């Protein structure tokens, strides 16, 4: 047998919350919401930038599979997760998660198909700028 021991450190956050007054918890939640609102613009800029990276990288789709190419699409996709919701685009956040799943599936199965990725990226652009539908 191993000498390894499993330890469960005390959950200090849970203890602090359970000992805090409801007023203190409400103040913390209000501050957290204000902080998210303060970074929403920067998150929207990040979303715009990463969508541009996706669109640009997608235009360079190679004829044959290339090591690292799908990673050049996966990395900006995964960086949209969370940031899109904070920017006020929760559906774009879900689409980014879905795109990561699509890319992962293509990668895992050694498939080389542009269309599923292109459709996701186009849909994500419309989720960011729905007024483009006219």
Predicted segments with their positions:
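Extended, amphipathic alpha-helices with heptad-repeat/coiled-coil or helix-bundle character
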Residues: 68-105
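Long, amphipathic alpha-helical coiled-coil segments characteristic
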Residues: 25-71
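Short, Lys/Arg-rich amphipathic alpha-helical interaction segments
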Residues: 101, 105-134
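Regulatory/sensor and coupling segments of signal-transduction and defense proteins
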Residues: 1-38, 123-132
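Short, mixed-charge, low-aromatic patches
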Residues: 3-12, 50-58, 74-81, 100
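Alpha-solenoid HEAT/Armadillo repeat architecture
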Residues: 59, 63, 82-85, 129
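Histidine kinase transmitter module recognition
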Residues: 39, 83-84, 109
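Amphipathic alpha-helix face/heptad-repeat signature
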Residues: 39, 43-50, 69, 76, ...
């Amino acid at each position: 047998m191993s000498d390894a021991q499993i330890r469960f450190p005390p959950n200090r956050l849970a203890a602090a919350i359970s000992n805090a007054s409801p007023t203190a918890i409400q103040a913390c939640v209000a501050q957290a919401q204000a902080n998210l609102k303060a970074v929403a613009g920067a998150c929207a800029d990040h979303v715009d930038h990463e969508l541009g990276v996706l669109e640009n990288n997608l235009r360079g789709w190679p004829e044959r599979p290339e090591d690292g190419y799908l990673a050049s699409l996966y990395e900006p996709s995964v960086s949209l997760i969370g940031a899109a919701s904070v920017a006020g685009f929760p559906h774009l956040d879900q689409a980014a998660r879905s795109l990561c799943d699509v890319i992962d599936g293509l990668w895992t199965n050694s498939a080389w198909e542009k269309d599923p990725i292109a459709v996701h990226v186009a849909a994500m652009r419309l989720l960011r700028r729905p007024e483009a539908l006219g």
